[in-house]
C-alpha cells in the first residue's frame, strides 16, 4: 500500500520506518528538516515516569516504552549525567513521603542524597534517579539514517493538503499542534486541546551544575538539563515557559510569535521571560543568578485540556475512518509503542 505520514517529528518518523518494511511510505514535513518543532524545544529527557506522580497512567505508559527507546537510539544517549528529582518544601502537589511511595509502587529506582547546588531550605527531599537524556542532534542524525535505510520518501518544506486523501491508501496524521488541521472534513473527530506558546531558555551555568539534570517537583517549578555536547543547559519552568494558551480545535498565535516558532535557538529574541526564569530558579539554586543567557527557543506545545490536576501526558493513537489514523504524541519515549499501534491498526484493515 501507499501510505502518507504527515509530520516529521519523532512519532511520524518512527511510524514511517516501521511501516516501510511492508509498504511504500511518504513522509511530509512542513519545515526544512525533521525534528524541528516541539521535538526540538525539548528537555531531551527519556521519561521513565518519575515526572508524573499524579498520573499513574502516564507513568505506566512511559515506563513500559522506556527500554525500547533506549535500545533503538542507544547512540544518542548522553553518558555521565546524574539525574535528580527534588520535592519542593513549599507548594508541591505531592509531598515527599507520597513521592517515595509513588516511586516504590512503580519500581522506579532512587537514592536519597544531598545536592550541594540546591538551597537546602527550599526542598524537602532530593532523590538521585535512574533516568537518561538524549542528544537531539545525534537523534536527528540517527533518524535520517533509519529513514534512508528503510526507503521512506521524505518531502521537506511541504504542507500536506486534502489531496493526500485521494492519492494514498492510508494517511497517518502526526502533526502534534496541528493534528486537527487535516480533519476539517471530520468535525466530529476533532478534539479540543490546550495549546501553549512556550519558550525554553538556554543558560551557561556555574561549574557546580556540570553533568547534572535537576527537576524540582511537583508543581509550578522548573527543571535544568544539559544540552548534548554543549556547555549550556536548557531550562523549563512550568509557569514562565508559557507566554499564552488557549483551549480549542486550533492554536491562537499572536503575530509577534510567528517569526520565532520552530526556529531553534534564537540569540537575543525580541522578547523573553528570562528574568522570570532567573527569579524562579534562584529560589532553589543560589548561584542561578550567575548564569549567562545564551538564547531561547519557541514552539507550540499541545496537551489534553483539563489535565492540570494530574499533569497527564498520554500518547493517543486513534482510527478516524477506514484510511485515516491520528497520533497525538505524549512523551518521546512512547514513539515506538505508538508506531506499533499504528501498524496493528493498518494490519487489521487489510
Please give the residue ranges for each predicted region.
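N-terminal Rossmann-like FAD-binding beta1-loop-alpha1 element of flavoenzymes
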Residues: 2-26
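Glycine-rich FAD pyrophosphate-binding loop
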Residues: 21-41
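Central helical "cap/lid" subdomain
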Residues: 35, 170-217, 227-233, 255-256, ...
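Dinucleotide-binding Rossmann-like beta1-alpha1 core, especially the glycine-rich loop
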Residues: 43-118, 122-125, 261, 265
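Helix-loop-beta segment of a Rossmann-like dinucleotide-binding subdomain
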Residues: 77-87, 111-150, 321-329
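Helical element adjacent to the flavin cofactor pocket in flavoenzyme catalytic cores
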Residues: 127-165, 170-183, 335-343
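Flavin-binding catalytic cores
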Residues: 230, 242-299
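C-terminal catalytic lobe of FAD-dependent flavoproteins
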Residues: 276-350
Amino acid at each position: 500500500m501507499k501510505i502518507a505520514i504527515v509530520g516529521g517529528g519523532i512519532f511520524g518518523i518512527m511510524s514511517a520506518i516501521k511501516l516501510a518494511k511492508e509498504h511504500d511510505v511518504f513522509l511530509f514535513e512542513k519545515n526544512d528538516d525533521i525534528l524541528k518543532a516541539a521535538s526540538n524545544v525539548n528537555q531531551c529527557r527519556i521519561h521513565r515516569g518519575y515526572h508524573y506522580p499524579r498520573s499513574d497512567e502516564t507513568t505506566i505508559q512511559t515506563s513500559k516504552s522506556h527500554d525500547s527507546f533506549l535500545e533503538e537510539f542507544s547512540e544518542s544517549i548522553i553518558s555521565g549525567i546524574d539525574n535528580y528529582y527534588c520535592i519542593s518544601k513549599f507548594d508541591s502537589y505531592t509531598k515527599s513521603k507520597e513521592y517515595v511511595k509513588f516511586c516504590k509502587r512503580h519500581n522506579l529506582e532512587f537514592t536519597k542524597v544531598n545536592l550541594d547546588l540546591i538551597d537546602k531550605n527550599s526542598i524537602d527531599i532530593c532523590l538521585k534517579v535512574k533516568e537518561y537524556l538524549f542528544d537531539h542532534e545525534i537523534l536527528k542524525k540517527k533518524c535520517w539514517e533509519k529513514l534512508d535505510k528503510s526507503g521512506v520518501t521524505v518531502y521537506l518544506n511541504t504542507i500536506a493538503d486534502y489531496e493526500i486523501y485521494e492519492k494514498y491508501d492510508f494517511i497517518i496524521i502526526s502533526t502534534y499542534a496541528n493534528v486537527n488541521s487535516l480533519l476539517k472534513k471530520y468535525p466530529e473527530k476533532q478534539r479540543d486541546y490546550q495549546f501553549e506558546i512556550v519558550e525554553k531558555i538556554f543558560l551557561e551555568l556555574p561549574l557546580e551544575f556540570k553533568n547534572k539534570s535537576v527537576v524540582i517537583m511537583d508543581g509550578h517549578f522548573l527543571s535544568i538539563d544539559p544540552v548534548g555536547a554543549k556547555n549550556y543547559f536548557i531550562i523549563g519552568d512550568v509557569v514562565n515557559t508559557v507566554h499564552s494558551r488557549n483551549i480549542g480545535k486550533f492554536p491562537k498565535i499572536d503575530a509577534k510569535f510567528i517569526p520565532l516558532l520552530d526556529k531553534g535557538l534564537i540569540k537575543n529574541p525580541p522578547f523573553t521571560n528570562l528574568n522570570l526564569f532567573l527569579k524562579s530558579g534562584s529560589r532553589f539554586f543560589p548561584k542561578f543568578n550567575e548564569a549567562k543567557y545564551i538564547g531561547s527557543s519557541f514552539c507550540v506545545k499541545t496537551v489534553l485540556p483539563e489535565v492540570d490536576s494530574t499533569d497527564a501526558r498520554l500518547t493517543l493513537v486513534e482510527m478516524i475512518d477506514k484510511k485515516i489514523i491520528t497520533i497525538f504524541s505524549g512523551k518521546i519515549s512512547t514513539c515506538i509503542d505508538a508506531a506499533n499501534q499504528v501498524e496493528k491498526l493498518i494490519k487489521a484493515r487489510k
